[in-house]
Amino acid sequence: MAEEQVNLSAGLAPDCEASATAESTVSLVGTCEAAAKSPEPKDSDSTCVFCRIAGRQDPGTELLHCENEDLICFKDIKPAATHHYLVVPKKHIGNCRTLRKDQVELVENMVTVGKTILERNNFTDFTNVRMGFHMPPFCSISHLHLHVLAPVDQLGFLSKLVYRVNSYWFITADHLIEKLRT
């Protein structure tokens, strides 16, 4: 299938994240590059920690109730904010650079799940929320995942850098959706 793939590197650059165990950080650049070369999503990758979590093969990760059958949500193991959740597709998708125009709805659904999880946890000030993706090669897990962070006004110095809006290494969900649509 020769579907059009959006070039997110124009004007930006590198998605992924440091929210898994040490063994999952082995070959970051190689796995992100491999994912970028293969835009067709696989159902699952046995070497991917997020695929194992989605397949309920990681009993140490508590899945949060998610009303979307194609997505899972769980707390980040290294939270940068009081509320720091990851919304992850069950199907293996490498990162935000591998997304195509026809996958805008997936990203929108990820945002909806993020907002719903925040509301369920009594956080409703959406002006104080940041949702976005790390860009390759600045990712530790080469499986698409949305960071949901709140309250952002309480992020520490390093977290403000790591999750800096529309930087070389982090793109907000809204900006990604806009890029995918153009």
Swiss-Prot record:
Pfam families: DcpS_C (PF11969)
EC class name: hydrolase
Gene3D superfamilies: HIT-like
Nucleus among keywords: yes
InterPro entries xrefs: HIT-like (IPR011146), HIT-like_sf (IPR036265)
Short motif (Histidine triad motif): ranges: 143-147
Family named by the database record: Belongs to the HINT family.
Organism of this sequence: Pongo abelii (Sumatran orangutan)
Recorded GO CC terms: cytoplasm; nucleus
EC number: 3.9.1.-
Binding partners and assembly: Forms dimers to octamers and even larger oligomer. Interacts with CALM1.
Catalytic residues identified in the record: 145 (tele-amp-histidine intermediate)
SUPFAM superfamilies: HIT-like
Superkingdom of the organism of origin: Eukaryota
Function: Exhibits adenosine 5'-monophosphoramidase activity, hydrolyzing purine nucleotide phosphoramidates with a single phosphate group such as adenosine 5'monophosphoramidate (AMP-NH2) to yield AMP and NH2. Hydrolyzes lysyl-AMP (AMP-N-epsilon-(N-alpha-acetyl lysine methyl ester)) generated by lysine tRNA ligase.
Residues the record lists as binding AMP: 76-77, 145-147
Reactions catalysed, as given in the entry: adenosine 5'-phosphoramidate + H2O = AMP + NH4(+)
Gene: HINT3
Transmembrane stretches, start-end: none
Domain HIT: 49-160
N-acetylalanine PTM sites in chain numbering: 2
GO molecular function: adenosine 5'-monophosphoramidase activity; nucleotide binding
Alphabetical UniProt keywords: Acetylation, Cytoplasm, Hydrolase, Nucleotide-binding, Nucleus
UniProt subcellular location: Cytoplasm; Nucleus
Cross-referenced PANTHER family: ADENOSINE 5'-MONOPHOSPHORAMIDASE HINT3, APRATAXIN-RELATED
Full protein name: Adenosine 5'-monophosphoramidase HINT3
